[in-house]
Amino acid sequence: MTITFSAVILAGGQARRMGGVDKGLQLFRNQPLFEHIYQRLQPQIADVAINANRNQQRYAQSGLPVFSDDLAGFQGPLSGILTALQRAQSNFVLFVPCDCPFFPMDLFAKLKHAVISQHAQLAYAHDGEREHPTFCLVSTSLAPALAQYLATGERRMLTFMQQQHAIAVDFSATPDAFKNINNLVDLQT
């Protein structure tokens, strides 16, 4: 059986630390943040979509498929992940947040190797010091378990991942690759 993969850029948050603006559309080095993410994703995986809960028309101008969370009220990244898993035509979905334009060019390859070699359903990035759970590769078969988890009111990504025996994949050689842009000052760097 051939295992298939797709990717989703997570741009569905409220961006409270950035004053509530749509973070994925903020210009960084003369381009919206989500476009930087797509440019790094595209060489790694061909099938890419965007999870956005506002400004869908603007995101759709990129030519990429755009979808919003099925759960209303900005319930966090797991809500977008659940919606993506339920809609995916692939066996696994790679997730990348819209605010980390320097993520590793081997992100998909390393996460894919981890899930295949260890027969896992979920793998996420770890930089040697911190977990980066929004950089993850998730089996679509986990959608029912995630729906149950969210129905309890829980929203913590790492708790869900630990319950699913997720694999932390070592990216300690490139810890700065996971630096995210959290405020308007960061956009100027």
Curated annotation (Swiss-Prot):
Positions contributing to GTP binding: L10, A11, G12, K23, N51, D69, D99
Location(s), subcellular: Cytoplasm
Chief place of localization: cytoplasm
Annotated CDD domains: MobA
GO molecular function, one term: GTP binding
EC number: 2.7.7.77
GO cellular component, one term: cytoplasm
Annotated residues for binding of Mg(2+): D99
Alphabetical list of Pfam families matching this protein: NTP_transf_3
Catalysis performed (reactions): Mo-molybdopterin + GTP + H(+) = Mo-molybdopterin guanine dinucleotide + diphosphate
Protein function: Transfers a GMP moiety from GTP to Mo-molybdopterin (Mo-MPT) cofactor (Moco or molybdenum cofactor) to form Mo-molybdopterin guanine dinucleotide (Mo-MGD) cofactor.
Quaternary structure and partners: Monomer.
NCBIfam families the record matches: molyb_mobA
The protein's name: Molybdenum cofactor guanylyltransferase
Organism the protein comes from: Pasteurella multocida (strain Pm70)
Gene of this entry: mobA
